[in-house]
């Protein structure tokens, strides 16, 4: 082989190697995103201030009363036992939250940003440092890992089905969690995992998650339970100190006091 041919092949090999490295870097690392969509880009950009369908200056106050058929005997809506109280979901939050004016898009709630490689083989959530539970403790990666495991092992069968294609969950930092998916073509998996409610490990780890309970749970959402009487009523009160009240996804929402 002549020296010229060797140099040519060497340059081609070097160029090919560089292209492969660049491609792998693109697949392995995704820039942090404020929101994700199943196809294309989400409607709202990274600097949006509120959803279009809300009044960001809506006054706070007042009461709303709703009728519910039947009774309730538990404040744990995540297992198969008992009848959860209507509206109990207002106590809990998910990593991401959808908007009401577009399909298959989600934006950061507990998660401040999301990282997804081009092939959607994983999703990484970066949690907001200000995110807190009602008891004042910070929401961390440990809470996310705990929530995933307890929902999958002791929650309703829905969660086992939902998370069946999650191959691995890793804590990358105090506020960073990575979900790696099994091989396949399900582009919806990052959105599915983003809908996962985040529960307090401190509160739940020494309690029976599979049991019915009327002990008021620790959540992180915009409302707390003010008072209740089983079989008759439950009153939710807006949390004045709710950590997420000024987030773009929440601005103009949760205006009723009770």
Predicted regions and their residues:
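Gly/Pro-rich hinge or "lid" segments in bacterial periplasmic/extracellular proteins
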Residues: 71, 91-104, 193-258
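N-terminal lobe/hinge region of extracytoplasmic solute-binding protein
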Residues: 31-119, 126, 149, 218
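N-terminal secretory signal peptides that target proteins for export/translocation
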Residues: 1-12
């Amino acid at each position: 082989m002549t020296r010229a041919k060797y140099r040519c092949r060497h340059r081609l090999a070097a160029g090919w190697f560089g292209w492969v490295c660049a491609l792998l870097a693109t697949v392995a690392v995704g820039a942090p995103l404020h929101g994700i969509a199943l196809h294309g880009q989400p409607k709202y950009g990274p600097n949006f201030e509120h959803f279009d369908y809300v009044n960001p200056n809506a006054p706070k106050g007042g009461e709303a009363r709703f009728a519910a058929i039947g009774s309730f005997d538990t404040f744990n809506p995540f297992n198969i036992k008992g009848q959860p109280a209507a509206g109990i979901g207002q106590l809990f939050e998910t990593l991401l939250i959808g908007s009401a004016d577009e399909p298959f898009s989600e934006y950061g709630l507990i998660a401040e940003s999301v990282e997804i490689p081009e092939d959607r083989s994983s999703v990484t959530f970066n949690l907001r440092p200000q995110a807190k539970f009602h008891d004042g403790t910070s929401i961390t990666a440990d809470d996310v890992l705990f929530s995933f495991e307890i929902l999958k092992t002791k929650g309703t069968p829905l969660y086992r089905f939902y998370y069946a294609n999650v191959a691995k969950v890793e804590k990358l930092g105090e506020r960073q969690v990575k979900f790696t998916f099994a091989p396949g073509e399900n582009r919806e998996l990052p959105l599915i995992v983003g809908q996962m409610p985040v529960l307090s490990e401190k509160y739940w780890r020494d309690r029976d998650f599979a049991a019915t309970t009327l002990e008021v749970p620790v959540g992180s959402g915009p409302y707390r339970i003010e008072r209740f009487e089983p079989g008759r009523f439950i009153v939710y009160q807006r949390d004045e100190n709710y950590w997420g009240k000024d987030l773009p996804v929440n601005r103009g929402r949760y205006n009723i006091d009770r």
